[in-house]
């Protein structure tokens, strides 16, 4: 098993997390090379088994550690970059430029120039004015550039604040048709894809089905009006990490107790990908298009989320509060939005033996009032020195870790051969000072 207790100690891919904590200290991140590759292959197999041509572009902003990118480059993944430095990093990690796409809601002329000079062939466009910038950049680079138009969510009331915020990005259906007509006349730009985004952690086939119908209807109108055959439909990100739970009112009142095996895993990812692929193929076969488009996706959480854990130590206790040496700096997403499994490294006694544990609030190590890692979490009785593993810690964690009131922890890669290698040093004074410009002598206080 990926996570399991052996002789009373939590192991990840056969490696003792307590043993690693003794070696490395805490807190630290541990990423599984095998799990990364398995998650990617599961999505790839699921879509291929559904009988659709597919492209998977790993969303690099989810976790752009070089060790992660190297594993995925070797696996054959494509990549979605969100800034020019990410493009450069992807190239250094083994991604050829033809397997890189670029998406940023605010396109900057200087950055577009660098991205096109690097050979990136596909750029996402979020608003009509972006076409002017891209046309100019393509002409300066002497390049013909493929364009993916982002289709904005429409229809009905937004069901959540996040849904409402998401609708600020992209083009409406009429704007997509206008852009398609313009691109059909452009000597430098080619309409290659329509993309959309339903939101994070989407597992409902109904939502994807509605979006597929809408995009396929647009492709028919584009083909009829311009003669252009759009060859790719991109469902964007949102494919979930199946071990991460959305939080609702019921969750906030519950007292959960986590188990190592109560997670998703590559098998469930493959099943979900197959369901998405079959639904897309069924709908595409029902419309009049010259060919079934390629189905593209930009998974992030689904690949890297459950491939990592954050190990942290309880440093002190005060009533129901356990104070840890990790903080929300390392896991920035609010526990009021998502809930991850939290496992003690020492196997808890069986509840049947009269040890049900108790519920705790888990505080981070900073003075930030909101530095709370979880609330009302049922765990075995905790004492200072106890170790906890925060599961599903691979997405939007290391890439967003900051030196606010504490420095980011080290990151280690658990290799497929069972060896552990450090892939990011813990934050130190050099990291803190590197971007700063200082006077040659210390500043004097007062007059």
Q: What is each of the regions a protein language model found here?
A:
Residues 59, 146-152, 195-197, 234-236, ...:
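Short beta-strand segments
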Residues 69, 92, 112-116, 134-137, ...:
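Short acidic, glycine/serine/threonine-rich loops at helix termini
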Residues 16, 32-35, 39, 43, ...:
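General structural feature for long, well-ordered alpha-helical segments within catalytic domains
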Residues 95-97, 164, 407:
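Short, solvent-exposed loop/turn segments at the edges of secondary structure
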Residues 1-145, 185-186, 190, 224, ...:
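A charged N-terminal "starter" segment
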Residues 62-64, 85-86, 106-108, 127-129, ...:
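Active-site-proximal loop/turn and secondary-structure-junction residues that shape catalytic pockets
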Residues 154-313:
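Active-site loop/helix belt of alpha/beta enzymes
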Residues 271-286, 290-447:
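Charged (often Lys/Glu-rich) extended helix/loop segments that serve as interaction or gating elements
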